[in-house]
């Protein structure tokens, strides 16, 4: 006889979290394993937590890809890696003028945070100086919050970025430590954690998340959320694998929209006070249920990603308005 699974009281669990009770790994796994028919109850419960901490505000972020491709790392998901055969644009560093122009485009798109991203293992000191020059001009001419994602950092580089006015540094954990060697062999999971810690020690707000759908188990998916809690990431981008043709993971089965919603809800339960951002793969994986994701998440990227297209900013603005939510400048 098939065992009947006991239905959880998701709303009670949400109020427990609001009252600052820490949920267990078993609770997180239960969210991920719940029957699909419970998804609206789960998202409603996640919204209780989201609304308590963030109301109806949605933070918009914009990415600029300042250096594309030409990366010596072999990350299996990435179209910019040395082993990728994906047909992407490849170029060296954009000029400081172009980076500053991008900041003004971010403002036109109603973004409060501008994310300066560059491919590669780690920046040289000269490259850090190049970014710092642009950051200083952006800080002098706009009210944007600035996030950088430049690869591995040493302590001196992190300190200089902080001094220049970089508010946030993104360095994703990407996947579970047990799954890491199957995704990348040119650096380790611990290398990534180290850079997050260096940024935090320099006084920069840490941004770190994962790419879901790269072969991790349900249990590992939950443990990623608790690892992000442990390293105290202030902003958590939840990416969903886009199986790009020409990369080693091109044949990987992508998550269903409901699986993505469960990830977002679980992440909100485990990290209730943190910025949860629906990131890469939003349009492709969530598809028509994108708006429901914002009942757990409180942040999205507006416009294109690094090498994949996003939807038009007007579509995102309309989605937010239709939900009765409102755009917030990303105060840290």
UniProtKB/Swiss-Prot annotation:
It holds the Pfam family BATS. Catalyzes the conversion of dethiobiotin (DTB) to biotin by the insertion of a sulfur atom into dethiobiotin via a radical-based mechanism. Homodimer. GO terms for molecular function: 2 iron, 2 sulfur cluster binding; 4 iron, 4 sulfur cluster binding; biotin synthase activity; iron ion binding. This is Biotin synthase. Keywords: 2Fe-2S, 4Fe-4S, Biotin biosynthesis, Iron, Iron-sulfur, Metal-binding, S-adenosyl-L-methionine, Transferase. [4Fe-4S] cluster binds at residues 71, 75, 78. PROSITE patterns: RADICAL_SAM. Pathway: Cofactor biosynthesis; biotin biosynthesis; biotin from 7,8-diaminononanoate: step 2/2. It catalyses: (4R,5S)-dethiobiotin + (sulfur carrier)-SH + 2 reduced [2Fe-2S]-[ferredoxin] + 2 S-adenosyl-L-methionine = (sulfur carrier)-H + biotin + 2 5'-deoxyadenosine + 2 L-methionine + 2 oxidized [2Fe-2S]-[ferredoxin].
């Amino acid at each position: 006889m098939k065992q009947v699974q006991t239905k959880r009281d998701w709303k009670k669990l949400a109020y427990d979290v609001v009252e600052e009770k820490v949920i267990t790994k078993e609770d997180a796994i239960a969210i991920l394993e719940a029957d699909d028919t419970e998804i609206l109850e789960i998202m409603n419960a996640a919204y209780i937590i989201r609304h308590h901490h963030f109301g109806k505000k949605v933070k918009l972020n914009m990415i600029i890809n300042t250096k594309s491709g030409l990366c010596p790392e072999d990350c299996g998901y990435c179209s910019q890696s040395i082993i990728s055969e994906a047909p992407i644009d490849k170029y060296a560093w954009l000029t400081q003028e172009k980076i500053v122009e991008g900041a003004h485009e971010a403002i036109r798109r109603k973004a409060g945070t501008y994310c300066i991203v560059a491919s590669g293992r780690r920046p040289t000191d000269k490259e850090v100086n190049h970014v710092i020059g642009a950051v200083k001009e952006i800080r002098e001419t706009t009210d944007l919050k600035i996030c950088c994602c430049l690869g591995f950092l040493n302590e001196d580089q992190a300190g200089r970025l902080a001094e220049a006015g970089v508010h946030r540094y993104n360095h994703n954990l990407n996947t579970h430590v047990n799954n890491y060697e199957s995704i990348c062999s040119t650096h380790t999971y611990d290398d990534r954690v180290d850079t997050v810690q260096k940024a935090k020690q320099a006084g920069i707000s840490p941004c770190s998340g994962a790419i879901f759908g790269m072969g991790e188990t349900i249990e590992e998916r939950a443990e990623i959320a608790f690892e992000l809690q442990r390293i105290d990431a202030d902003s958590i981008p939840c990416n969903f694998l886009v199986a790009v043709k020409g990369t080693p993971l091109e044949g990987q089965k992508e998550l269903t929209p409901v699986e993505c919603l469960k990830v977002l809800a679980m992440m909100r339960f485990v990290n209730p006070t943190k910025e949860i951002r629906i990131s890469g793969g939003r349009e492709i994986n969530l598809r028509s249920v994108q708006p429901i994701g914002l009942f757990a998440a409180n942040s999205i990227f507006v416009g294109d990603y690094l090498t994949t297209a996003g939807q038009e900013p007007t579509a995102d603005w309309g989605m937010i308005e239709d939900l009765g939510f409102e755009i917030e400048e990303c105060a840290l």
